[in-house]
């Protein structure tokens, strides 16, 4: 049973903590917060996690709020086999020095630059690259979504190049200080966006260019993907491959799943914790091969698709499972992923 510390108990961190707790080969030894808010309280009182603080000077604030703390982040990582770092992107470099000093392995999130660790991770496409290493980085939610489907398609279609338009949600549902609320914003207003180069960190040699924009919604991202392929394949072959791939769902707009709102409702119907949709939904009707070009549309639940990737990254770094598909299957079973 490996010991996992979660540094940063926010949107991703709290989900990773619950995912770790659901496994039978690892356990949560602590989570961290910097402020005594409702997440801090529920972590301790509802989830039963030991809570450590990232800013020791705020210990009195937690005491005044009546939230029990177990120590500092430095204390927490001493007991860990690996730290899953879910802190804001600007904190990563200084945390890395702390982890190195403590001699503990660490997994970062996609908000950090690839250069921080020199390794990026996706369970399907490059699990082996991080096996036994000290530090890696799970790529962002959008990059995870692109990589899952492209790495499934490539073996049968032989991808020549990819062009994708990323329609990004303006903010997460709980964020009240971000937007836009009445605008479409090129983000960034140049090509390429960072998503294409990020895909290249986990799919070596792929020719991919992306452009992105923000829209006034909070539910999910949506991708419009155009792929030039070398092999002659039928549309149904692409559909079959995507249907066989776990963590990808081929969904039918004709059955009432024609929007991101309906996909989120579907997650509720599945009884998912926090209404999470870990899988990447691809609209069946959008999948089309025309000559040497493949087109499809997909959605990404930005709060949760990277969560199972973090579990597999733990197994890779700690050499708990050498076969990526076995780790994926184990994670999926514990989390109820299709």
Swiss-Prot record:
Pathway: Carbohydrate degradation; glycolysis; pyruvate from D-glyceraldehyde 3-phosphate: step 1/5
GO biological process, one term: glycolytic process
InterPro entries referenced in this protein's UniProt entry, alphabetically: DapB_N (IPR000846), GlycerAld/Erythrose_P_DH (IPR020831), GlycerAld_3-P_DH_AS (IPR020830), GlycerAld_3-P_DH_cat (IPR020829), GlycerAld_3-P_DH_NAD(P)-bd (IPR020828), Glyceraldehyde-3-P_DH_2_arc (IPR006436), NAD(P)-bd_dom_sf (IPR036291)
One GO term describing the cellular component: cytoplasm
GO MF annotation list: 4-hydroxy-tetrahydrodipicolinate reductase; glyceraldehyde-3-phosphate dehydrogenase (NAD+) (phosphorylating) activity; glyceraldehyde-3-phosphate dehydrogenase (NADP+) (phosphorylating) activity; NAD binding; NADP binding
CDD domains: GAPDH_II_C, GAPDH_II_N
One Pfam family this sequence matches: Gp_dh_C
Binding annotation for NAD(+): 11-12, 111, 169, 302
Keyword terms of this UniProt record: Cytoplasm, Glycolysis, NAD, NADP, Oxidoreductase
Catalytic residues of the enzyme: 141 (nucleophile)
Assembly with partners or alone: Homotetramer.
Family: Belongs to the glyceraldehyde-3-phosphate dehydrogenase family.
Name by which UniProt lists this protein: Glyceraldehyde-3-phosphate dehydrogenase
Species this chain originates from: Methanobrevibacter smithii (strain ATCC 35061 / DSM 861 / OCM 144 / PS)
């Amino acid at each position: 049973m490996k010991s996992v510390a979660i540094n940063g108990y926010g949107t991703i961190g709290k989900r990773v903590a619950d995912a770790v707790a659901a496994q039978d080969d690892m356990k949560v030894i602590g989570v961290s917060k910097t402020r005594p808010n409702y997440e801090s309280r529920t972590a301790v009182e509802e989830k039963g996690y030991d809570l450590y603080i990232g800013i020791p000077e705020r210990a009195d604030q937690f005491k005044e709020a009546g939230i029990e703390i177990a120590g500092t982040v430095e204390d927490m990582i001493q007991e860990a086999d690996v730290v899953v770092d879910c802190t804001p992107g600007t904190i990563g470099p200084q945390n890395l020095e702390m982890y190195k000093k403590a001699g503990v392995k660490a997994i970062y999130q996609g908000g950090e630059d690839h250069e921080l660790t020199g390794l990026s991770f996706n369970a399907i496409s490059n699990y082996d690259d991080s096996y036994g290493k000290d530090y890696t980085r799970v790529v962002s939610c959008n990059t995870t979504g692109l990589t899952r489907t492209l790495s499934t398609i490539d073996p049968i279609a032989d991808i020549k190049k990819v062009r994708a338009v990323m329609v990004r949600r303006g903010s997460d549902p709980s964020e009240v200080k971000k937007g836009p609320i009445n605008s479409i914003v090129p983000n960034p207003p140049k090509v390429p966006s960072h998503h294409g180069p990020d895909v290249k960190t986990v799919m070596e040699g792929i020719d991919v260019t992306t452009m992105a924009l923000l829209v006034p919604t909070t539910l999910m991202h949506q991708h419009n993907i155009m792929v030039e392929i070398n092999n002659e394949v039928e549309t149904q072959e692409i559909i079959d491959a995507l249907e066989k791939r776990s963590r990808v769902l081929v969904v039918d707009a004709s059955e009432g799943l024609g929007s991101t709102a309906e996909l989120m409702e579907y997650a509720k119907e599945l009884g998912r914790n926090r209404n999470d949709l870990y899988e990447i939904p691809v609209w069946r009707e959008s999948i089309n091969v025309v000559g040497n070009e493949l087109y499809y549309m997909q959605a990404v639940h930005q709060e949760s698709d990277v969560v199972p990737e973090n579990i597999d990254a733990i197994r890779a770094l700690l050499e708990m499972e050498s076969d990526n598909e076995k780790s994926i299957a184990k994670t999926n079973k514990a989390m109820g992923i299709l």
